[in-house]
Amino acid sequence: MLDAGSDCPIGYIPCGSTNDFAATLKLSTDIMTAAAEIMEGEAVEYDVGSWNDRYFSYIASFGAFTRGSYATPQNLKNALGHLAYVLSGIQELPQIRNIPIRLELDGEALEGEYLFGAVSNSTSVGGLLTINPRLVDLRDGKFEVMLVRMVRDTAELAECVAALQNQTYDCAAITFRSVSRLTVHQSPELDWTLDGERAEGRETITIQNLHRAVRLVQKREEP
């Protein structure tokens, strides 16, 4: 739609295995109900993202547990649903490593080694991690950025787990920001995942929030 320059409202019927974006928008996963809500709904403007010359709806991520979203065979997804991603993540455990990157986040420079990173506009990340809904606004022109490095010891692991469960993110191993634009400098061998699809790595990646760039049809709110 963006490539075509079209402003046509989009009706979205969630049919995937995880449906993170639909969960954030509170869309029905029942096909007939979703279709009826589209027919009777109203168009609402939402942010989307650009990743160099590509677009994504709700998440761009790299590192631990991100490969499974595009590497898991479709027949396994169909048979097991969300469990297929969990099993794929378990297979990735021996390959988890720290990844050196440099970032500029709305002018703030960061450099470090991270095992996971996500740029998202969703309260649910891979169905495994929930971001505090009070921190997520799909129409504010900003993404939530989460970077997680390897913990140093069991005490820091416990602190990190508590910070994720409490949705406070006040842990030395976690960096959390809300930004509208970021630039990433990395190894070109590091692939990303955009809405569950593989994006081949680049040395420099620019990610930008496209403020209210698309219109999605949603169920009308009760007066």
What is the meaning of each model-derived region?
Residues 2-119:
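Catalytic core of DAGKc-family lipid kinases
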Residues 45-48, 98-100, 114, 133, ...:
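Short, acidic/polar N-cap/turn motifs at the starts of alpha helices
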Residues 61, 65, 118-134, 198:
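Glycine-rich phosphate/pyrophosphate-binding beta-alpha loops
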Residues 76-83, 124-155:
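Gly/Ser/Thr-rich active-site loops/lids in small-molecule metabolic enzymes
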Residues 97-99, 113-115, 139-144, 178-180:
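A generic structural signal for short beta-strands and their flanking turns/coil linkers
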Residues 105, 111, 137, 147-223:
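ATP/nucleoside-binding phosphotransfer catalytic cores, i.e., glycine-rich phosphate-binding loops
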